[in-house]
Amino acid sequence: MADSAAMAADGLVVRPSRATDGPFLQSLYQTARPDLQWIDGEQEQVQQVVAQQFQVQEQGMGDNYPNAMHYVVEKLGTAIGALSTDFGPNEIRVLYLAFIPQARGQGYGRAVLQGVQKAAQQVRCPVATVVWTSNPHARRHYLALGFAVEQSNPAAERLVWYPQG
């Protein structure tokens, strides 16, 4: 992750996001939040709520993690996902990881997270994330990669992976 672009398995590239990625990132957010499509209202109104929620997430990340690094995941030059991380003093935090629907279930998330784990192993630093209880699929993926539940409440769990050695 420290390189300007890190090559992952199967032609994946994780590169820093650019201002021109805004439309892709907003569209990706919409696909990652199907719950927002259940809002009762005109489609235009729903789109406005999705856009507002995207801005709230972006601002919240900026306020809480001002040094966060934002990446776009590409497969053979096509944007397929996004990753946001924060390299804190005691841990690397995975703040956001999402993929377009067509890229889900292909092992790309695993490859990206293994890249984060490799970077953490090199600096002997744990990796932490928060997974909402409404996302059991993500929870299973993190647990399969060796993350363990460190804190839990009815809404979310804090999962942490510790480097070996």
What would you call each of these model-derived segments?
Residues 110, 134-155:
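Conserved active-site alpha-helix within GNAT-family acetyltransferase domains
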Residues 100, 104, 129-139, 155-164:
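Conserved beta-strand-loop-alpha-helix junction that forms the acyl-donor binding cleft
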Residues 13-38, 150:
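A short beta-loop-alpha structural element at the N-terminal edge
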Residues 1-20, 27, 163-165:
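Conserved N-terminal entry element of GNAT/NAT acetyltransferase domains
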Residues 33-60:
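Conserved GNAT-fold acetyl-CoA-binding loop/helix
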Residues 120-132:
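Conserved GNAT acetyl-CoA-binding A-motif
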Residues 99, 105-118, 140, 144:
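Conserved acetyl-CoA-binding loop-helix of GNAT-fold acetyltransferases
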